[in-house]
Amino acid sequence: MDATYWGKNFGVLLIVDAYRKRLLWRKFLDKKETIADYLEGIEWLREHKFKILGIVCDGLWGLPQALARYKVQYCQFHQVKTVDEYLTKNPQTDAGKELQKIAHLLCHTDKKSFIGMLDMWYEKWGEWLKHRTLDKNTGKKTYTHRRVRSAYFS
């Protein structure tokens, strides 16, 4: 399940059968997609007796919770894009550079290896991620490496 846009006011929400690579349902959109749009597609599948084995979707806020009765996986492509947004295309820290390399292996490795790489990265950089800096404006301590931290926890 995913939506694609052309400009700001026209898009299409698609549901594709991952096994047969066949379009099952679509809805044209004149604004951003909503959870209700996705649920409309799921309901159409159910009405037409499709067996839903799992759902791969983007990170629309609240969508996994709305689809909690199904196995839901966050799209690997979107996950890598999220990491890139936090780290930028040219990370400034060694930790960020290493994390980005690991993220880009997501689609090319198995679960056990990927988790192992993340665990090793965290073992090396975990304490560094916890560093805090005093914000002179608020007087509160904030995480020093917020973007790398956000990328890791995303």
Where are these regions (language model features)?
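RNase H-like nuclease fold core
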Residues: M1-W61, Q65-Y70, R147-R149
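Short, amphipathic alpha-helical segments
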Residues: K32-L39, C57, Y74-F77, T93, ...
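Conserved beta-strand -> loop -> alpha-helix junction used to position metal-binding or nucleic-acid-contacting
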Residues: G54-A103
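Acidic/histidine-rich catalytic cores and adjacent linkers
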Residues: F50-L53, C57-W61, A103-S154
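Short, charged/polar low-complexity linear motifs in solvent-exposed/disordered segments
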Residues: A18, W25-R26, G41-E43, T82, ...
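Generic preference for hydrophobic/aromatic residues in regular secondary structure cores
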Residues: I15-V16, L23, V72-Y74, L99, ...
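Repeat-unit-sized solenoid/scaffold elements
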Residues: D37-L39, E43, K89-G96, G139, ...
